[in-house]
Swiss-Prot record:
Protein name as catalogued: RNA pseudouridine synthase 1
Keyword flag rRNA-binding: no
Active-site residue list: 134
Broad EC category: isomerase
GO BP terms in the entry: enzyme-directed rRNA pseudouridine synthesis
Higher taxonomy: Eukaryota, Viridiplantae, Streptophyta, Embryophyta, Tracheophyta
GO molecular function: pseudouridine synthase activity; RNA binding
Keywords: Isomerase, RNA-binding
Lineage: superkingdom: Eukaryota
InterPro entries per UniProt: PsdUridine_synth_cat_dom_sf (IPR020103), PsdUridine_synth_RluA-like_CS (IPR006224), PsdUridine_synth_RsuA/RluA (IPR006145), RluA_PseudoU_synthase (IPR050188)
PROSITE patterns registered for this protein in UniProt: PSI_RLU
Gene3D superfamilies: Pseudouridine synthase (3.30.2350.10)
Organism (species): Oryza sativa subsp. japonica (Rice)
Record has RNA-binding as a keyword: yes
Enzyme Commission number: 5.4.99.-
Amino acid sequence: MTRLPLLLHSPRFAAALTTPPPPPLPPARRLVAAAAGGDLSLAMSAATGEYPVPVSPPYPAASKDVELRRAMTASARSAAYSSAPVVFEDEWLAVVDKPAGVYCDALLSALPCSAATLGDEATKPNLHLANRLDRDTSGLMVITKCNKVAGKLVKAFTEHKVKKTYLALCIGYPPAWEKIKICSGHGRSKHGAWRVYAMSDVGRSLPGGSVVRDMSTRFEVLGINGKGQFREPSNFEVDETESITVQEKAADLTSDGDEKNSIILVRAYPQSGRTHQIRLHCQYLGFPIRGDVKYSGVIEWNGVDYDGHALHAESLSFVHPVTGLPVTFRSPLPSWANEFISTMA
């Protein structure tokens, strides 16, 4: 049976681990990461004190072909993309709903700017992306219309003053907790792959001249295998949740046999803004996002091949950079979330 990750955790979380372990993963089609020569050299470098060793697995070799196919499809789709759904728009910014499988930059040319532009109506606004989403992630993005507003809002995102929530549909081990906060390191390994690192490695040098940086995410379980309750985003504080500090290698997600798997709907509250942060933490916790081939997610489930991962930028809350008023925006739920919620008892 696959062993759960070894973690530094709070006493209550330790008690939760004394419960009977969940069944191993099912025989769903999943791209398995084999040990790569690059990671062996990383381990050797770490042994000499040069580089830290990642605690999450490398990209599966077969994911390269899947990612290339998805990228080609997204490029064609982005080139033809002509109308971005607008959730909100005023003189200074627009909040749009990005579909999955479209690159962020396509939204700039697809934004149907209203008459509410700065200055002369004949002057085209200077559009900027205030935030970005991965190609296959759907949900809310903010587009600013002038340099001054762009600078203020980008700074707000960089300084983590924008509150964000995401929904993710995962396939893996059902967690024993309802809410949790996970803290780890984050960085690129020798061949450029984003990986999870131990918190004790934060600040250490990595190949390519970068360093391990800290990242933290709060998770809330909304449903497991059709049981649970979909609810509004929580405003919970740190002391209300269990806390995990990553120090050890993640569990091996491969398994044999006919064991069943769990379908898990989680809401993520990223506390930092690292690349692929939610995807990496879901992988480490043992329930990778469905369709996320880079990070151990199944590419086929219940007879269906998925062309992207099930991750959605659900909400954004921030102080308007011009009016100074607090604003909150919500995105309509994606079809995969509605389908799961409809099965919840």
